[in-house]
Swiss-Prot record:
Database matches in InterPro entries: IolE/MocC, IolE/XylAMocC-like, Xyl_isomerase-like_sf, Xyl_isomerase-like_TIM-brl
SUPFAM superfamilies: Xylose isomerase-like (SSF51658)
Gene: mocC
Gene3D superfamilies: Divalent-metal-dependent TIM barrel enzymes
Listed Pfam families: AP_endonuc_2
Protein's name according to its UniProt entry: Rhizopine catabolism protein MocC
Length: 325
């Protein structure tokens, strides 16, 4: 099956699955945030909280058989995995060769899309600089970049993994307007990873962005935003990471993002991908299992109210019967 086939079938019952990113427990960008938390604890607590899947994190095995064994042990599927793209700085052939091992891992584990963020011109610097200092594409660069990204997405689709482009603070595609521009200069094989929190943090309107690009959305990151921290971050020109440490993000239903409207729009337009709770916080301040449970409970309730039906995996009450794992 090729990556352009709908993730769970546009004409099937409105059944979706909920996953979580391990960033709730451990932040790969900031080792002091959960760096000593073992992978086994992350996965066990994901399942205890009710999740059907996980995205990749830095502690996960990168060999297909080993990763499958550990995910099977906890009854989890692989929803996707982040890739630090460099397409702005590379040609398509070089970028595809660089990402191929990652795509292979995702395909082997059944993930339908890769989380692709273009971190050219220094994402890791960008997320630590004031938000006003992040990299930008010049006006004349958009068309050429769109052609390159479309070519890359077509190569990925032929391989069997779709491209889900992640708009992200501190990168060349950050704001709602830049997402609009990107969608206008790329072909349909370029799917959109819709991230409610990054839209809000950038000064956008997550509901309106979701409505405008619903037919291109193939993967969803569900993060909420604390309004007081958002205002302080934008007024004070904080860096992305400083805002995270101040608590800008939280799980769905615990902030100011209008998730009922977002989910209703996704249901209306036939979305069948994953809903991923991906809300980085300081685990010393926001107890991971507590927030994981809160996020799943809130998102499941709001998704059901919007017309989605949770898969049996999310409804399953998992009991950890392992010994000394």
């Amino acid at each position: 099956m090729k990556a352009e086939d709908p993730p769970f079938g546009r004409n099937s019952l409105m059944s979706i699955k909920i996953a979580i990113n391990p960033i709730t427990w451990t932040n790969d960008d900031v080792p002091e945030l959960g760096g000593d938390t073992p992978l086994e604890q992350c996965l066990s607590e994901m399942r205890q909280a009710g999740y059907a899947g996980t995205e990749l994190g830095g502690k996960y095995p990168r060999q297909s058989a080993a990763l499958k064994r550990v995910l099977d042990l906890y009854g989890l599927e692989l929803a996707s995995g982040w890739w630090d793209g460099r397409l702005y700085e590379r040609d398509v052939d070089a970028e595809f060769e660089a990402i191929l091992p990652h795509l292979t891992l995702l395909r082997d584990l059944g993930a339908r899309h890769v989380v692709y963020a273009d971190t050219s011109m220094g994402r890791h610097d960008g997320i630590r600089q004031p938000i006003s200092k992040r990299p930008r594409l010049r006006g004349e660069e958009w068309e050429a970049y769109g052609r390159k990204l479309t070519d890359l997405a077509e190569r990925m689709a032929e391989f069997g993994v779709g491209l889900a482009f992640h708009h992200h603070m501190g990168t060349i595609v950050e704001t709602d307007e830049e997402v609009d521009r990107l969608m206008s200069v790329t072909g349909e094989r370029v799917g959109l990873l819709f991230d409610s929190g990054h839209s809000a943090f950038s000064g956008g309107d997550p509901v309106a962005l979701c409505v405008r690009h619903a037919k291109r959305i193939v993967h969803v990151h569900c993060k909420d935003v604390r309004g007081d921290v958002l205002r302080a971050a934008r007024e004070g020109d904080l860096s992305f990471m400083d805002a995270v440490l101040e608590g800008i993000f939280t799980v769905p239903g615990d902030g100011g993002v209008d998730f009922p409207s977002i989910l209703e729009n996704l249901a209306k337009t036939g979305y069948r991908g994953w809903l991923v709770v991906e809300a980085e916080q300081d685990p010393n301040q926001a107890h991971p299992l507590t927030y994981a449970k809160m996020g799943h409970e809130n998102l499941a309730r709001m998704a059901a109210a919007a017309g989605f039906r949770l898969s049996s995996a999310d409804a399953f009450d998992w009991i950890d019967t392992r010994q000394n794992v």
